[in-house]
Amino acid sequence: MKKKIEFVYLGASGWCTTCRTINPLFTKEAQRLQELHKDTADISYVCYDIEDDEKGIELVEKYMVKSIPSMLVFVEGEFAEKVTGSAIPKKMEGFV
């Protein structure tokens, strides 16, 4: 059975320069991991802009996100960890 992992990226593209840098790196790394681990893991990812996306705003409140960019990681449907800042792409493979 494949391990189920979901990466949720939270950023603000309008004013956060770090978010604009990390967002494409997050997406590229998520796609790379999907391909690399396609036989052993079911990896999904989504990006939310916390300025105008209601679901993103809900997640910020629920998981008490205090800084952006942030990534929420869910393993087997359970919240596993919150990662912030430029470390996001580097830490993703550790969850697979």
Question: What feature does the model see in each segment?
Answer:
Residues 49-54:
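Conserved acidic residues
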Residues 7-8, 45, 71:
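Hydrophobic beta-strand anchors of alpha/beta hydrolase catalytic cores
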Residues 38-45:
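A generic structural motif
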Residues 55-59:
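Short acidic active-site motifs
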Residues 62-64:
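Short loop/turn motifs at secondary-structure junctions and domain boundaries
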Residues 66-96:
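Non-catalytic, surface beta->alpha helical segment in thiol-disulfide oxidoreductase systems
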